[in-house]
Design a protein with these regions (language model features):
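Flexible loop/turn segments at secondary-structure boundaries
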Residues: 43-44, 67-71, 146-149, 184-187, ...
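Short, well-ordered alpha-helix to beta-strand connector turns
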Residues: 31, 56, 105-106, 204-206
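Helix C-cap/helix->beta junction micro-motif
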Residues: 55, 135, 171-172
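The Walker A/P-loop phosphate-binding site
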Residues: 1-82
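Phosphate-binding/switch region of NTP-binding enzymes
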Residues: 22-24, 41, 160-256
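Hydrophobic/aromatic beta-strand patches that form the interior of the parallel beta-sheet core
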Residues: 34-36, 60-62, 109-111, 177, ...
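Conserved inter-motif catalytic segment of the P-loop NTP-binding fold
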Residues: 59-153, 239-242, 253-256
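Replication-associated primase and helicase/ATPase modules
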Residues: 1-16, 25, 104-108, 130, ...
């Protein structure tokens, strides 16, 4: 992967985004791997995109699961408050207007390789280092099952990928955020338990959040938290206001 060129540093918290997270010691930290896990459609990517946009820190977003057009549409909605259908129309018919709004996310650097290997991820990080003169502060992998690993069975490959991503976090002092699936056979009411995370990859992340969607709310449960409160059952989540049509995600007291 990457040669370790400096002593391990890190652990600094990333900029806060949601008060509900701060109040419950849900903190994303540099030089650590964190994970957001949930069933398909639960809002994992929406939460990750909101974090990337609002932290305003140099970010590498590896969007293996979603194409560039869809991510632009989602991001435009999140920035402007338009619905995704309205955003798609504006991006198509008035690209200059769209570019002006999307400039608020100029700190996010994108890769849309649908099956990146660890070497590809390393190359993307190196390209940002050459451009900015420093490593990205946040690296988002969306999602773990799309990371290509040579040989071996699928779950073993995911565990190997997690080990390499931990090395990457330490080497770059970046907060690495991995999106992953939970088993659909487990209840997601309000959130899946830690045992539902696929592939037995629970050991390495410092923070694991599972998510569930409930009407106009997103439940976010810290099922593992090295630096704060956790409940492996997923039964004690924090709540955010959530409207996926508008890519709207906010603390309850800020709901519009």
């Amino acid at each position: 992967m990457r040669a370790v060129g400096r002593p391990d540093i890190g652990g600094e918290p990333m900029p806060p985004v949601f008060r509900a997270f701060d109040d419950n010691q849900i903190i994303f930290r540099r030089a650590e791997v964190s994970m957001i896990a949930g069933q398909p459609g639960a809002g994992k990517s929406t939460l990750a995109l909101a974090l990337a946009l609002r932290m305003q820190a140099p970010t590498l977003y590896l969007s293996a699961d979603t194409n560039a057009h869809t991510m632009a549409m989602r991001l435009y909605s999140m920035i402007t408050g338009n619905s995704q259908s309205e955003s798609e129309k504006i991006i198509s018919e008035n690209p200059e207007q769209a570019k002006q709004a999307l400039a608020q996310a100029r700190h996010i650097y994108w890769s849309f390789d649908s099956n990146p290997g660890l070497g590809d991820i390393d190359d993307e990080v190196t390209a940002i280092e050459e451009l900015l003169g420093e490593s990205p502060a946040l690296i988002i992998v969306d999602n773990l099952m799309d990371v290509a690993m040579d040989g071996g069975e699928e779950f073993g490959g995911m565990r190997s990928a997690m080990k390499e991503l931990k090395y990457l976090a330490r080497d770059t002092n970046a907060a690495v955020l991995v999106l992953h699936h939970t088993k659909e056979s487990y209840s997601a009411d309000p959130c899946p338990p830690r045992s539902a995370v696929q592939g037995m990859v629970n050991q390495l992340p410092a923070l694991i959040l599972t998510v569930g969607q409930h009407q106009e709310m997103m439940a976010v449960a810290p099922v593992k938290n090295r630096y704060g409160k956790a409940d492996p059952s997923g039964n004690t989540p924090v709540w955010l206001r959530f409207n996926p049509e508008y890519m709207y995600l906010a603390d309850l007291e800020e709901a519009r």
